[in-house]
Amino acid sequence: MLACHHNCKHFGICGGCSSPQTEYELSLKAKELALHNLFSPLIPSQKILPVIPCSPILRGRNKMEFSFYQTVDGEKTLGFISPSKPKKGIPITECLMIDERAIDILNYTRSWWATHPELSAYYPPLNKGSLCTLTVRIGNVSNDFMIILTTSGREEFAVPLSVIQEWQKTLLDSGLPITSIFWEEKLSARNSPTTFRTTHLYGEQFLKQQLSIEGRSNIFHVRPRSFFQPQSRQAEKIIQTIKDFISPTGEETLLDLYCGAGTIGISLSPYVKKIIGVELVPDAVASAQENIQLNSANMEVFLEDAKQFCRRHEHLPPLDIVVIDPPRCGMQNKALKYLLRMSPKKIIYVSCNPLTQISECSILVEHGYQLQRMQPIDQFPHTHHLENVVLLERLSF
């Protein structure tokens, strides 16, 4: 396991890492113990497999979002916002979780911002200000970068295109391996869902990520708003765990709920008869459809809310396997209700939030399912977060 001999200079104040980088093994044991205690009412400890450590434990993140921030006195920072009260902007100059060149991009953006004092940082509670976030995504095929600048879409805080183009030129003149640059305008209004207007400024429309399972490699095109697991090597371990848990014969139909860009379904497609993917985010569905063609996968994807899809298909014969990888908030009660009516033989529940996961697994157990195996996988070293893969099987039909 890779050792870290020093802590990041921002440790303890930025809110990113909750345990010292020099104490990874200790933090891993603490996560494992907490998970055992949490799930002990539902599954014997011998069915919980040892946590799979993160590898690498440093600079493995393929995505990082940085926030623009300013105080009431006008002091401006670009980096993270501390969890302390009152909140503080932390001008990040080092981060051991991501490629060092991401910090270079941060610095070039700071320099550009300094030449435009008229641009204020966005303040979400009042929906005021111009500059929201800077997102850096890194592809593992060519180790190249996608940069996304998010600004306010409100007319009174709009950033002129000419100013955005100055930022673009600053980045391109840096010599960094930037594959694509996007500008997003955040359209937010009271009592309305937040949407984004995206402008492609430079380069490719997507970033390339590669995942390999048992010697089979797939290439995935990831767009600005597509979800992709934040640690590519850990994503492979998640998918391998799912494959091992379901023990496919090649004759199964697998429903992949919250399928995102199709990473799980496409990776599993050689092992089952058919994959059906369901995803609500149009950008992710576009990526999934592109990735299906790119990898010649036997998968069909639907642009639909998981709850609506399950409700429409609740009276069909029981599916063989359902894989759910929902947001941190979980499936929610109604979606879970319709999933239960579909009565799949096996359910794989992947979650980055064990608290939500155990709540919904408890409901599944109450309705005839049993937890058979559990595999925790560390995706966020030096934090309290832990990815968890659970196999549930229906006891009777």
Swiss-Prot record:
Gene3D superfamilies: 2.40.50.1070, Vaccinia Virus protein VP39. The keyword S-adenosyl-L-methionine applies. S-adenosyl-L-methionine binds at residues 229, 258, 279, 325. Keywords: 4Fe-4S, Iron, Iron-sulfur, Metal-binding, Methyltransferase, S-adenosyl-L-methionine, Transferase. InterPro entries: MeTrfase_TrmA_AS, MeTrfase_TrmA_CS, SAM-dependent_MTases_sf, U5_MeTrfase_fam. [4Fe-4S] cluster binds at residues 8, 14, 17, 95. Disulfide bonds: none annotated. This is Uncharacterized RNA methyltransferase TC_0118. It comes from Chlamydia muridarum (strain MoPn / Nigg).
